[in-house]
């Protein structure tokens, strides 16, 4: 062989070794090291980037196949990337920062794609350990979309991701984790546009010279930026090669049933002209609203992480099958509403986003191809704040936008009694005392039904329930 050829091959080998040392993108099948700072990027599908067909084009939500992939991917992440290690942090897209279709539906795919994974981890709060982990979805300053309530206050420890990182809060979050040099596993869940831009910004800001993916290959591909204690960075690609079915997930076994006896029965009505009652101006007509509580979340009275626990995943996934029976003889939901999961707070030194109501009804909306909307124009605040009850009542029961609809609403249960009390009070024109309403702390099953007829006359009761017994629910999430 000529000396020039030998020299060229040696130079090529040297160049390749340098490239590898700078963190060339390589496919990996090995566990990530718990001695490194690991940033794991789960890429959720959206309408613009959905090569595997995981999104419903009408609702911009996951379809059954997308939900199945999310459930299966959770097990892959735990088994193939983390092993026995626990996650350190989970940051997901704030849904209201990415509105899709002409109906401006929020992007719920990112938190829906990572929820099952969160429940395969553990957290200890004030002495209680359970299978759950907070999802950070909160707004950073400057990222609150128009028309969305500004946090009061902002909760930096619960910061999520903005679809367009206009104020560079995404990159500040990621580089802050890297520069903190604390080993762990930090998961980011967002669409390809957000993930790709964030990887590029990290690469530039940190001077890594990594070879980045140039196109979206589908949500089977997971990217891991792993940084050693010495500062050497590598970008690894994991291909889960999942082939989920396009049918709704089937739980491993049937859940124990429950009767509708957790609350004392009540029923109230307000009819125009009866006992001096007048229907308030602007009241909706021909409307039914089902109020349900989020899934199981409190293994003890001092446990709070903004999410529900693994037992609650059984309820959330079962709703698609049990609600039709629970609502037999009643009108079926035509749309689903919940609280903006980006609303965040602190509890016992922990910063969390209030994701559990929306994630409780997300599977039901997916199974039934229903529009999923978030209430984001006001902060949910304290249940005892009369302004919150008024804002909630006005949103759901006045203005005509929800007339002629049957709405399934997942909310925080302590807000229900003040909400219903306020709504009844708006009809007062006679000698009606305030109702003595309450919702037991351990009740995750009861359904409150509010109906407005064609004239706006009101009836409310708590006769229905989902029919799922809480206590027998498994303490670990179903695995797929």
Regions found by a protein language model. Give the residues of each.
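Generic beta-sheet signal
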Residues: 38-40, 181-190, 287-289, 402-411
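Bacterial Sec-dependent N-terminal signal peptides
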Residues: 16-35
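Active-site-proximal alpha-helix that buttresses catalytic centers in soluble enzyme cores
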Residues: 29-175, 195, 200-402, 416-480
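Small-residue packing motifs within transmembrane alpha-helices
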Residues: 9-13, 17
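Bacterial N-terminal signal peptides that target proteins for export
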Residues: 1-9
């Amino acid at each position: 062989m000529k000396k020039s050829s030998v020299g060229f091959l040696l130079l090529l080998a040297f160049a390749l070794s340098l490239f590898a040392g700078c963190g060339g993108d390589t496919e990996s099948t090995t566990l990530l090291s718990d001695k490194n700072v690991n940033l794991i990027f789960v890429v959720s599908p959206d309408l613009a980037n959905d090569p595997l067909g995981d999104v419903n084009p009408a609702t911009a939500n996951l379809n059954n196949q997308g939900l199945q992939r999310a459930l299966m991917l959770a097990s892959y992440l735990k088994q193939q990337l983390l092993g026995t290690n626990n996650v350190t942090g989970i940051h997901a897209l704030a849904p209201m920062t990415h509105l899709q279709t002409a109906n401006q539906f929020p992007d719920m795919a990112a938190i829906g794609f990572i929820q099952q994974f969160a429940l395969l981890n553990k957290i200890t709060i004030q002495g209680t350990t359970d299978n759950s982990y907070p999802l950070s979805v909160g707004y950073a300053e400057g990222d609150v979309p128009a028309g969305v309530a500004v946090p009061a206050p902002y909760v930096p420890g619960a910061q999520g991701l903005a679809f367009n990182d206009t104020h560079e809060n995404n990159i500040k979050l990621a580089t802050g984790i890297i520069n903190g040099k604390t080993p762990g596993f930090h998961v980011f869940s967002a669409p390809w546009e957000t993930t790709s831009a964030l990887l590029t910004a990290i690469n530039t800001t940190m001077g890594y010279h990594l070879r980045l993916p140039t196109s979206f290959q589908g949500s089977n591909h997971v990217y891991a930026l792993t940084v050693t204690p010495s500062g050497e960075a590598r970008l690894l690609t994991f291909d889960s090669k999942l082939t989920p079915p396009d049918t709704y997930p089937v739980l491993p076994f049937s859940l124990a049933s429950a009767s509708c006896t957790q609350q004392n029965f009540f029923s109230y009505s307000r009819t125009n002209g009866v006992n001096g009652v007048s229907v308030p101006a602007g009241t909706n007509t021909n409307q039914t609203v089902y109020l349900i509580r989020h899934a199981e979340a409190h293994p003890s009275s001092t446990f709070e992480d903004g999410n529900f626990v693994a037992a609650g995943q059984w309820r959330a996934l079962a709703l698609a099958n049990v609600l039709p029976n629970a609502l037999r003889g009643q009108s079926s939901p035509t749309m689903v509403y919940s609280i903006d999961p980006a609303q965040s707070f602190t509890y016992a030194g922990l910063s969390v986003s209030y994701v559990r109501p929306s994630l409780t009804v997300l599977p039901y909306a997916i199974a039934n191809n229903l529009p999923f909307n978030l209430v984001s124009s006001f902060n949910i605040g304290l249940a005892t704040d009369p302004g919150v009850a008024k804002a909630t009542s006005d949103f759901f029961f006045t203005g005509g936008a929800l007339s002629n609809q049957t709405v399934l609403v997942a909310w925080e249960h302590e807000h229900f009694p003040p909400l219903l009390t306020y709504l009844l009070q708006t009809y007062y024109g006679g000698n009606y005392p305030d109702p003595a309403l309450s919702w037991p702390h351990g009740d995750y099953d009861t359904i409150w039904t509010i109906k407005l007829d064609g004239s706006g006359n009101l009836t409310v009761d708590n006769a229905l329930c989902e029919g799922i017994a809480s206590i027998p629910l498994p303490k670990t999430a179903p695995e797929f």
